[in-house]
Amino acid sequence: DNVSKIAIISDIHGNMPALEAVFDDIRKNDIDKIICLGDLVGKGPSCKRVIDFCRYKCDVVVTGNWDKFLSHKMEERNRWYLDRIGEERLQYLRELPESVGFYLSGRFIRLFHAHSEDVYLRMYPNLEIEEKLKMFNIPKISRLDNEERKSDIVGYGDIHGAFIDYLEDGKILFNVGSVGCPYDNIPMASYVILEGEYGMKEQS
């Protein structure tokens, strides 16, 4: 059996107790690979610990808008965060890619924090279908994969509310919700588990 289980987490926002709770659940689920879709920092108090934890526990980390904003802007109003995170971790955040793509059981999946065009764009579930389909284009943001193709499945974070949308031609758009700061009126961490044959280009 070549089926892999991939956990996708996002939007921890310095909430270490929530991150530890999610990883307790991940351990129970025999996960093979862990991907984090960014926003490690901001809002919560434990940004430094969250960065260190995700850096060593996740197989892939992509940047979020908070990670990019805090590490690039270096504004005085963010001094509290910047002093606690420290320059070495800020440099780590600056170097994170913006997207990752891979094949799973014949479907090409691409994951990023917020949008295929810009980490600061927002994609809400009530937007028009034309806007949603833009998420499947070859990203204009930096990426870890070299696949010059549109995606079959897209997963993202940013809006702190999990949903799944089945679109035309078998396309699937999903949001993983938030580990540390949910906005969906459910005061619990959420994350996604994908199952399939990792790296398999043929449909299984």
Report each predicted region and the residues it spans.
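His/acidic metal-ligating clusters that form di-metal
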Residues: N29-D30, E88-I164
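Active-site environment of divalent metal-dependent phosphoester hydrolases
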Residues: H13-A18, G42-P45, W66-H72, E117-V119, ...
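Flexible, charged surface loops at secondary-structure boundaries
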Residues: D1, Y56, N146-K150
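Short loop/helix-cap segments at secondary-structure boundaries that form the rim of catalytic
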Residues: F53-C54, F102, I164-D169
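Core catalytic region of metal-dependent phosphoesterases/phosphodiesterases
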Residues: S4-R94
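Structural motif
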Residues: I6, K33, V60, I109-R110, ...
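Active-site-proximal beta-strand elements of phosphoester/diester hydrolases
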Residues: K5-H13, F108-H115, L173-G177
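Acidic, His/Gly-rich catalytic cores of divalent-metal-dependent hydrolytic chemistry
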Residues: D165-S204
